[in-house]
């Protein structure tokens, strides 16, 4: 039997209660991850969020470098939840239940009482009966756990502080609710603190980074527009990424910068270091298991299989120039060139990424003239060209490769009018490309160890305390994979040797070399694609004023985050 009087004193529960006798026969042993706000550090919080992520997903489903959470269809109930046990300085403890299919909080246990958000459907209502089966009192709220409802009860997220202190207070509020010691508005705010500092931080490296900064400086502050729009857009971003064609979106997703200004995201590239986990939306098309050179085109009879769109994009490459059909003439064999990106609808810079792995402009195919290095790339009739000469793969690291030849698209010069060729892949800047409809470099600050910012200092680079809008801390991320100081976009972040410990410098972008091409990885590192080394704060000591390249080990001196 369940005692109901102490719960009904708030008028917060619904008539939807349930019995647990059947589930007590076989109690579920869900994984438990612990975190305490007592003496919490950046390191303890980072390890906690990493543990949450590792229990949420097996890593078996990874798309565009980003892990996908389990599909709820067919997921055994024994694998449906994980538990997060939180404690604070007051030695109060509560346990949150997270649904592994969306990383979201579904309920909470405090002592011998458990309470749950109102489920959206009967399936979820049945699933939560497997949680906290040994408590004496268990009830559901009359409200669900989505932000719209919680904000109606507790106020807008933009006015609710986050940080170690707010999490400490939230734990106490959740604990005392079980004894009628917490009012509903405070309870709703406390849930929003926990959800953002745990669920949203697990979903987004970006939000985890925001929380690390608050913990490091013992700061209490509300989330800015960049955080709130990411939270609101997680589902749409997950859908856009999973339904993208080789990383290009069928339609843009609008996000906001910290200052509230809006921008559109047209492709997955900038999101790889931002999103840690995606909600499952659809299964990859069966053809994605095959080489794009030989993949079959089959009807999609499975509604669960991702759409395979054919977006029309520009292809931006070296020095921010675009792939262009020379002279807007589409006769067979006309060379492809680099040219300043247009803003109109001229077809000679608009490329359709087709399901058959061709890249087409005005109905004709991007084609290699011969399968040997230094041969020109041309426009050609798709039906008369050799099939293998017209097929391309677009990798997440911004390589466009012709699978038949194993050669990659390249621009041997960064000047307008340069004719494009195929070359042996050395991951040079001259071989970096991004299919997108945003032709401008993405301007950002890059935050690293101790929440300090990467700063260009003449020909050197090191970490300094972050200063809002400081020009030396602004970086332009180019489509070709180069990272350039916003103050001087002719210079590039460069490693001029492929040796562990090499100091990274700011040098001319002219060589467009392998040492100037980088990739922001989903694990938080910035990888040099050619040598496999990552950016590293030497000895974890910013006072040395040296950023080096080093083999990956995953410590915080190798973790970087672009902030927008």
Curated annotation (Swiss-Prot):
Keyword field: Disulfide bond, Glycoprotein, Hydrolase, Lectin, Nucleotide-binding, Plant defense, Protein synthesis inhibitor, Repeat, Signal, Toxin
Binding of beta-D-galactose 2, residues: 324-328, 337, 342, 348
Molecular function as annotated in GO: carbohydrate binding; nucleotide binding; rRNA N-glycosylase activity; toxin activity
Residues engaged in binding beta-D-galactose 3: 312, 437
EC number: 3.2.2.22
Origin: domain of life: Eukaryota
Record carries keyword Mitochondrion: no
Gene3D superfamilies registered for this protein in UniProt: 2.80.10.50, Ricin (A subunit), domain 1, Ricin (A Subunit), domain 2
One BP annotation, GO: negative regulation of translation
Enzyme class: hydrolase
Xref: Pfam families: Ricin_B_lectin, RIP
Segments crossing the lipid bilayer: none
Record field: catalytic activity: Endohydrolysis of the N-glycosidic bond at one specific adenosine on the 28S rRNA
Mapped 2-beta repeat ranges: 489-528
First and last residue of the signal peptide: 1-24
Glycosylation sites: 34, 259, 397, 437
GO CC, alphabetical: endoplasmic reticulum
Residues at the active site: 104, 147, 200, 203
Residue ranges of 2-alpha repeats: 450-485
Ligand binding (beta-D-galactose 1): 32-34
Similarity remark: In the N-terminal section; belongs to the ribosome-inactivating protein family. Type 2 RIP subfamily.
PANTHER family in alphabetical order: PTHR33453, RIBOSOME-INACTIVATING PROTEIN (PTHR33453:SF34)
Name of protein: Agglutinin
Source taxonomy: Eukaryota, Viridiplantae, Streptophyta, Embryophyta, Tracheophyta
